[in-house]
């Protein structure tokens, strides 16, 4: 399948490398960026931004111009004046380059008549160590030997002459080390420790807030982040920018001063942030401009250097002229920009070796802060913000993955339904039935051109125009199986301009040599919503020429003038899959011209599918039982009452309690007293469908194990469900933590004899390591050496994060930056004195084997109680436990397949119902007695009620009380008799009589409303009462109390009170709670009551449950307009049914 070129960007399937596609876009955009830069430099004040963006898209710079542009971006010769820069040789510390203001900032400039020595105090070749006091140059020397020097920033140093404090921020370049020096504000408490370990505290509250947010809400996540960054930094405006697939950007969240113009929803062209700048954001995650109007300071360097030094990673890099003008145009003087990076998309070329490669990173977006006056943020606070952005990146990763999974699930569901239609009516069915091809991917219209006939949906070109597109495809793209483009104009279709605003983008597939399916998209601008004042008048001398967010928006609209929203890879995969299905189900006319019939793909019968599903379920169940019994991890299970119904060999071995003796005992009787509440919590949560993770329980020991003390287990609770998804029990997959807790208890008792624990040679000792409060490794026990492959001498005195566990080729490599960020959060949380959660932590040992573990960390204290570091344990799950968890997932999938069978049964019930309706229609004209007609009428109402329930596919609308209610005229007594008929089988089986108590006028009462819903709720309440009533307790009474109200002169409202009374004690309280507060783990009866209560609420009514000393009652209050009310007055009657 071919794709047209739009902005030199190819649309391809996910099987192609996402990295390659991104590289292609970078290569395509960079000449445009260079062209814009050259035009700005050449025209300055007369630079017309909006028109230049459009021109740059049509023409690019020469190769030499691009090279000069990139060198200017990465090797600029100026820095901002709020600090000074020194570039040194990494071994001798000889000065290679320095900013002109360095001598003044370091107090090296003479105050009297200068001497030769003073003038040469700072020059190329100077030993930089002589500029600082002894402890400072020692710290700089030590940092220079470190592999990833960035992890040590900032380093507190003091100038030799004045003692003035600076933060030294170091990074490596091709010729040496760059040291950025930023003055420390005297009123700020300087950070005396190196690294991020202290900066974490500044952002701890914001990090905790981000981590507490629920998943699945990207908008909330971004809104909270901009507020937290605003509070941390104090900038006037904080915005979250997101880069879209085609590289253009959008403001998706904003927190600003009330008097500033909003930019929320603004889109801007890809060229607004050049690719070279994006590269710099990947190199230097935080970029601060203190004052865009300040005069930049020149860098002086050694003449022997062949090119200007790279300042990509410098915190002092001066803004380029065009960026400074952009800021000035929008009234901004200072800014702080932080990059948001996420894991790069992986190729779908199979899983082989995928675990052996660390994931790459890509720029997801930016966090941009602006201020209307000069503003300086100290480096520790910027570091804290960077750490916060790393946590945000982890959250974004989750959201991106969840969104992708949700989209794929939607497409798979739609494809399944479309396939079902194709089996009955291919290919027309996917246009004439619901869902249709427009549900497969987001589009504005679709068309099927099949056997010279046309079927259309939504906004499409005319029939003549579609035929012209078909002819164009056959002439110019005959060798491909289809085409996708976001711009028919740029794809070269000659009639694109004539299509107007209806169609800009198109995806087309061939289903035979002459037949096509089309998806159409309209203009991109239709999707754009900007919170700013894009329609406000612009200054007469501006007219969009000035660089400003408003002109960026105008430029963006110009760039996408002839373009639709791009087709995503997952969408093209779905379209291509449908094409394969269609081409397989239809015989191509060219292949067999004599046979124009459709070729139907034969599907296996439903019975065979059910049998196959049962066999699969049985196989999985048998395998799971075998694994549970033989697993080296303790596994136990209970039913909904909390009684043991599963107890594997390992659990019996640890506790000394044989399997046969454990079965049937309440779990709370087998745990020690302080675990009883934990077990009850787990069971209560499981009944609500909530599966608790990583909870600790202590089991009693018996027989030969009785003297060994309790068995301490870390358990994960898994809900066991039946075919109707009802929770029927809880399975506990556990890990024996007894040995670790013995060590922890010993560690707590001895309060400081950490070395005795770590060096204990016992095999029961788990992998243990210790760090100090600066993050350096102090101890590394034998078990850690075995599991990691790193010797103790190679780990001790190294930074845990950056030297021991790293994202580089040395140490124990982790998969991605997110893993290191999570580890850093854990360590910082412990050292700050908080109790952290356990961390699922994975890394590659020195042999390349991937190790998955659960990490526990606890604080270390000295004799005075001061926190001095952390003690950490690793718990590595056995292969059997991992296999058991995998089989559990397979079991859940099998249960889901069974649930699909229930959906099938629901579908098949509709045919017998239709047969019953047909039989009823035949009986209605027959000569029936009055009693027979009443019975037939009740039967009809039962059928209609069942049919309505079968159509309730959208339970959410019922829960939200906006489901549609029917409005028909009905007789109230007929509806009540139908309710009683539904309860009769259960009533006779339990020998419980049902009394009815209502006035005679009810038989004459004709109301207007949804009688079937009324029947449904009353029958459900009545069935629930029968379930919890015993024969000897007395009858159930259905009582109706009507009250009439006249509305005006021609309308009456019947206020009805239905009381369903049964003997005490009545329905269990837990079930009544489920009726009003539904949870995922609700019982079948609770779900029925909950739905009925919501239906009554939808009818503008209420439900109550009243408990009295001798009876309990459901009280339903509803009202209906009166359709016809007999004036005949009847005496009240009480009778049995």
Swiss-Prot record:
It comes from the Eukaryota. Pfam families: GAF (PF01590), HATPase_c (PF02518), HisKA (PF00512), PAS (PF00989), PAS_2 (PF08446), PHY (PF00360). Residues 217-400 form the GAF domain. InterPro entries: GAF, GAF-like_dom_sf, HATPase_C_sf, His_kinase_dom, HisK_dim/P_dom, PAS, PAS-like_dom_sf, PAS_2. Residues 904-1124 form the Histidine kinase domain. GO terms for biological process: detection of visible light; red, far-red light phototransduction; regulation of DNA-templated transcription. Keywords: Chromophore, Photoreceptor protein, Receptor, Repeat, Sensory transduction, Transcription, Transcription regulation. Contains one covalently linked phytochromobilin chromophore. Homodimer. Belongs to the phytochrome family. NCBIfam families: sensory_box. Regulatory photoreceptor which exists in two forms that are reversibly interconvertible by light: the Pr form that absorbs maximally in the red region of the spectrum and the Pfr form that absorbs maximally in the far-red region. Photoconversion of Pr to Pfr induces an array of morphogenic responses, whereas reconversion of Pfr to Pr cancels the induction of those responses. Pfr controls the expression of a number of nuclear genes including those encoding the small subunit of ribulose-bisphosphate carboxylase, chlorophyll A/B binding protein, protochlorophyllide reductase, rRNA, etc. This is Phytochrome C. The gene is PHYC.
């Amino acid at each position: 399948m071919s794709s047209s070129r739009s902005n030199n960007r190819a649309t391809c399937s996910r099987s192609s490398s996402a990295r390659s596609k991104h590289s292609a876009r970078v290569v395509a955009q960079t000449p445009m960026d260079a062209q814009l830069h050259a035009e700005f430099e050449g025209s300055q004040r007369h630079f017309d931004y909006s028109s230049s963006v459009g021109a740059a898209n049509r023409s690019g710079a020469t190769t030499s111009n691009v090279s000069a542009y990139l060198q200017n971006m990465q090797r600029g010769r100026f820095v901002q004046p709020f600090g000074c820069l020194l570039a040194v040789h990494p071994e001798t510390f000889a000065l290679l380059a320095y900013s002109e203001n360095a001598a003044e900032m370091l107090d090296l400039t003479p105050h009297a008549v200068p001497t030769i020595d003073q003038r040469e105090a700072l020059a190329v070749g100077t030993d930089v160590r002589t500029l600082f006091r002894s402890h400072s140059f020692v710290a700089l020397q030590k940092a220079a030997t470190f592999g990833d020097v960035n992890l040590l920033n900032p380093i507190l140093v003091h100038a030799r002459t004045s003692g003035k404090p600076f933060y030294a921020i170091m990074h490596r370049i091709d010729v040496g080390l760059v040291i950025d020096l930023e003055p420390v504000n005297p009123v700020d408490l300087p950070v005396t420790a190196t690294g991020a370990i202290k900066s974490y505290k500044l952002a701890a509250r914001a990090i905790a807030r981000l981590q507490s947010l629920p998943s699945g809400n990207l908008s909330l996540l971004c809104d909270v982040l901009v507020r937290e960054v605003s509070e941390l930094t104090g900038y006037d405006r904080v915005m979250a920018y997101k880069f879209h697939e085609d590289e253009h950007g959008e403001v998706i969240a904003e927190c600003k001063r009330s008097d500033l113009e909003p930019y929320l929803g603004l889109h801007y062209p890809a060229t607004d942030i050049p690719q070279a700048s994006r590269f710099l954001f990947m190199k230097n995650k935080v970029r601060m401009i203190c004052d865009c109007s300040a005069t930049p300071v020149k860098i002086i360097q050694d003449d022997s250097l062949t090119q200007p030094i790279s300042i990509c990673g410098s915190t002092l890099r001066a803004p380029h002229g065009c960026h400074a003008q952009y800021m000035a145009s929008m009234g901004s003087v200072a800014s702080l920009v932080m990059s948001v990076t996420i894991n790069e998309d992986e190729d779908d070329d199979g899983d082989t070796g995928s675990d052996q490669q660390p994931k790459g990173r890509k720029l997801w977006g930016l966090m941009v802060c602006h201020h209307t006056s000069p503003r300086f943020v100290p480096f520790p606070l910027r570091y804290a913000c960077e750490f916060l952005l790393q946590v945000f990146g982890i959250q974004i990763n989750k959201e991106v993955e969840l969104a992708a999974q949700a989209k794929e699930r939607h497409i798979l569901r739609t494809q399944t339904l479309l396939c079902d239609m194709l089996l009955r009516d291919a290919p027309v069915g996917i246009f004439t039935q619901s869902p249709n091809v427009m549900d497969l991917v987001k589009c504005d219209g679709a068309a099927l051109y099949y056997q010279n006939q046309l079927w259309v949906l939504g906004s499409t070109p005319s029939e003549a125009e579609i035929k012209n597109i078909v002819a164009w495809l056959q002439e110019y793209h005959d060798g491909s199986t289809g085409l996708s483009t976001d711009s028919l104009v740029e794809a070269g279709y000659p009639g694109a301009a004539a299509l107007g605003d209806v169609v800009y983008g198109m995806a087309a597939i061939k289903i035979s040599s002459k037949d096509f399916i089309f998806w159409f998209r309209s203009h991109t601008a239709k999707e754009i919503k900007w919170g700013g004042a894009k329609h406000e008048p612009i200054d007469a001398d501006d007219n969009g020429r000035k660089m400003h967010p408003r002109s960026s928006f105008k430029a963006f609209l110009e760039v996408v003038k002839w373009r639709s929203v791009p087709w995503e890879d997952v969408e093209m995969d779905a379209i291509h899959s449908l094409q394969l299905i269609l081409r397989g189900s239809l015989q191509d006319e060219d292949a067999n011209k004599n046979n124009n019939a459709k070729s139907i793909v034969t599907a296996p019968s439903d019975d065979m599918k059910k049998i196959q599903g049962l066999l699969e379920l049985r196989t999985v169940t048998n395998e799971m039982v075998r694994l549970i019994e033989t697993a080296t991890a303790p596994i136990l299970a209970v039913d909904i009452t909390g009684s043991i119904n599963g107890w594997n060999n390992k659990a019996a071995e640890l506790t000394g309690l044989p399997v046969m003796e454990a079965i049937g005992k309440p779990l709370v009787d087998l745990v020690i007293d302080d675990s009883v509440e934990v077990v009850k919590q787990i069971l209560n949560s499981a009944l609500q469908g909530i599966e608790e993770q990583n909870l600790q329980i202590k089991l009693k020991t018996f027989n030969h194990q009785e003297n060994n003390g309790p068995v301490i287990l870390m358990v994960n609770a898994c809900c066991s469900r039946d075919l109707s998804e009802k929770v029927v029990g809880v399975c506990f997959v556990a890990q024996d933590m007894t040995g670790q807790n013995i060590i922890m208890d010993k560690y707590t008792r001895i309060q400081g004899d950490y070395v005795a624990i770590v060096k204990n040679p016992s095999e029961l000792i788990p992998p243990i390591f210790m760090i100090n409060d600066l993050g350096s490794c102090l101890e590394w026990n034998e078990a850690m050496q075995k599991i990691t492959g790193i010797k103790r001498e190679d780990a001790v005195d190294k930074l845990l994060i950056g030297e021991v566990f790293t994202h580089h080729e040395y140490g124990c490599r982790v998969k991605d930056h997110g893993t290191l960020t999570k580890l850093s959060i854990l360590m910082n949380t412990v050292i700050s004195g908080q109790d952290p959660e356990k961390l699922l932590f994975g890394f590659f040992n020195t042999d390349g084997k991937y190790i998955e573990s659960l990490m526990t960390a606890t604080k270390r204290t000295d004799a005075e109680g001061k926190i001095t570091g952390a003690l950490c344990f690793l718990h590595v799950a056995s292969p059997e436990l991992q296999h058991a968890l995998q089989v559990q997932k397979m079991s859940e999938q099998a249960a889901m397949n069974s649930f699909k069978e229930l959906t099938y049964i629901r579908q098949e019930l509709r045919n017998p119902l239709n047969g019953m309706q047909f039989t009823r229609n035949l009986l209605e004209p027959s000569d029936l007695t009055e009693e027979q007609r009443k019975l037939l009428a009740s039967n009809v109402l039962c059928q209609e009620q069942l049919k309505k329930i079968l159509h309730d596919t959208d339970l959410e609308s019922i829960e939200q009380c906006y489901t549609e209610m029917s409005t028909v005229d009905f007789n109230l007594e007929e509806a009540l008799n139908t309710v009683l008929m539904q309860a009769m089988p259960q009533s006779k089986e339990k020998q419980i009589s049902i009394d009815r108590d209502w006035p005679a006028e009810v038989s004459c009462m004709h109301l207007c409303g949804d009688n079937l819903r009324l029947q449904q709720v009353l029958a459900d309440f009545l069935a629930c009462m029968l379930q919890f009533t015993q024969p000897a307790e007395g009858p159930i009474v259905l009582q109706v109390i009507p009250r009439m109200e006249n509305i005006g002169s021609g309308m009456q409202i019947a206020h009805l009170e239905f009381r369903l009374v049964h003997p005490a004690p009545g329905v269990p309280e837990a079930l009544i709670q489920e009726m009003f507060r539904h949870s995922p783990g609700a019982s079948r009866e609770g779900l029925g009551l909950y739905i009925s209560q919501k239906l009554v609420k939808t009818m503008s009514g209420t439900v109550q449950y009243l408990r009295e000393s001798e009876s309990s009652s459901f009280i339903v209050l509803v009202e209906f307009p009166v359709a016809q009310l007999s004036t005949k007055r009847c005496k009240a009657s009480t009778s049995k049914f």
